[in-house]
């Protein structure tokens, strides 16, 4: 059976929506919000009615009959840690999204708007594989400092989507495979997927792992402590070096990996040195995650925007193909991944989880 779905993915200055019939996109729109519009609201939750109205108006303009929808799917927000999967949006989830139990983020509005529209139409509302997806093995949580446990913050939606896609295309099923999935975008996450669970992954936001176009990844801890107490930097400035101004931005003042590779190929030695370190660190992280899986790796998967690179992918393959064969699913399609999560539940392939 084919279901019509409205997908809602709120970002800080835009709301991306898509209408799908099954896995086929009928249309997609990015609704941009000006600073003036956003500034009117004190909190992210205060933007709820405004964003909902904008979405409904666009659907009306497109003469789309919302009564034909089977379900609404929102981007999962900063909830309490949960295992991966598709969740029915309930009142407890909405309350946690309102207050942002793990921090304020525009994606918190995804589930709230989805439930509001879904309830009015008397159809289900879901979120899929939120960024707080946490399936870490207990042994992976210990960092070496009791007050600083390792956290699971990664590109869960895309990592899970491509892992399940490979499971389907290979005919083996995600739950029967050991995979190392590497998402390469503004941040880089390398996850060990053990029979359907991400048992270890670097905290790709502000934790550890390879550096990325904008993030520092793991850094020498003693020197970081000295930097914090040197009196030269505020907390925000140090954090900025980790997130936003780390990685390629820190070294080369750009987050454009393709541009860096182009310069390297024209003979720029500094670009070459940073690029080689980038490849080295990602390869090292893949090796680390293959040890987590005790060397039993069925496939390594590269995904995210940087996986389009005709230079980087072969360079990474050369370093890691001895561990396992490599599959490349470049880019990320968050709206489709959200649609697929809902379809698996509506088709009875998976059960909706309860928050």
Swiss-Prot record:
What's a GO cellular component annotated to this UniProt protein?
cytoplasm
Protein's recorded name? Butyrate kinase
Q: Per its UniProt entry, which superkingdom is the organism in?
A: Bacteria
Quote the InterPro entries the UniProt record gives. Aliphatic_acid_kin_short-chain, Aliphatic_acid_kinase_CS, ATPase_NBD, Butyrate_kin
Protein location? Cytoplasm
Q: What HAMAP family has UniProt attached to this entry?
A: Butyrate_kinase
Q: Which UniProt keywords apply?
A: ATP-binding, Cytoplasm, Kinase, Nucleotide-binding, Transferase
Family, per the entry? Answer: Belongs to the acetokinase family.
Q: What else is known?
A: Also acts, albeit more slowly, on pentanoate and propanoate, and on some branched-chain fatty acids.
The gene name on file is buk
- Reactions accelerated catalytically: butanoate + ATP = butanoyl phosphate + ADP
Q: Tell me the GO molecular function terms.
A: acetate kinase activity; ATP binding; butyrate kinase activity
One GO BP annotation is: acetate metabolic process
Q: What is its EC number?
A: 2.7.2.7
Query: In UniProt terms, what function does this protein have?
Result: Catalyzes the conversion of butyryl-CoA through butyryl phosphate to butyrate.
User: Where primarily located?
Assistant: cytoplasm
Q: Which Gene3D superfamilies match?
A: 3.30.420.40
Pathway(s) served: Lipid metabolism; butanoate metabolism
List, alphabetically, the PANTHER family matched.
ACETATE KINASE, BUTYRATE KINASE 2-RELATED
